[in-house]
């Protein structure tokens, strides 16, 4: 089993989402010892924002690419191939200004490739990255999930659910720690709830795998 571990928080050791992704990967490896992990730090190794040089190979232009276009295409190919090879993807996605970090959005822009992660058909778009499990470590300084007003400002989990679904990923799970900037007690409670969610998600996946194996 191949697991891709992605972090996108800019705050390093102070990052809650990085703490959570590390816990998720550790729990996953304990439950699935044969798992092989690849790590992608989108801050240390950030893809450039999407440009026409990055877009050029996707428009059917395959011959006569400039050096810049070749470089950008190599970055995109590395990232989309890494994503497609993974059975499980763990994504650290902190809540920045009501959305995700630009580093994470730049990664999504690189892997959103027609013919690779999705295609358009007579019946509409079809995702091509089916069969994956994605676990998102979602961290928020405030609380946005418990009120209509808060949910209206949330473009983090909702966006990731949408774009991953567009790629064909139907098994998307969220480990949420919110209110982590609202005092020590609130942060401790959020982290405890997230730890319980991690345990539940990993156990549920293992139980489902056992059922599939027995049925086979």
UniProtKB/Swiss-Prot annotation:
EC number(s) from the headed UniProt entry: 1.6.5.-, 1.7.1.17
Domain of life: Bacteria
Keywords, ordered alphabetically: Flavoprotein, FMN, NAD, Oxidoreductase
InterPro entries: Flavodoxin_fold, Flavoprotein-like_sf, FMN-dep_NADH:Q_OxRdtase_AzoR1, NADH:quinone_OxRdtase_FMN_depd
GO MF term (any one): oxidoreductase activity, acting on NAD(P)H, quinone or similar compound as acceptor
Names of required cofactors: FMN
Co-factor: note: Binds 1 FMN per subunit.
Matches recorded under Pfam families: Flavodoxin_2
SS bonds (residue pairs): none
Protein function: Quinone reductase that provides resistance to thiol-specific stress caused by electrophilic quinones.
HAMAP family assigned: Azoreductase_type1
Family: Belongs to the azoreductase type 1 family.
Protein name from the UniProt record: FMN-dependent NADH:quinone oxidoreductase
Name of the gene encoding the protein in the UniProt record: azoR
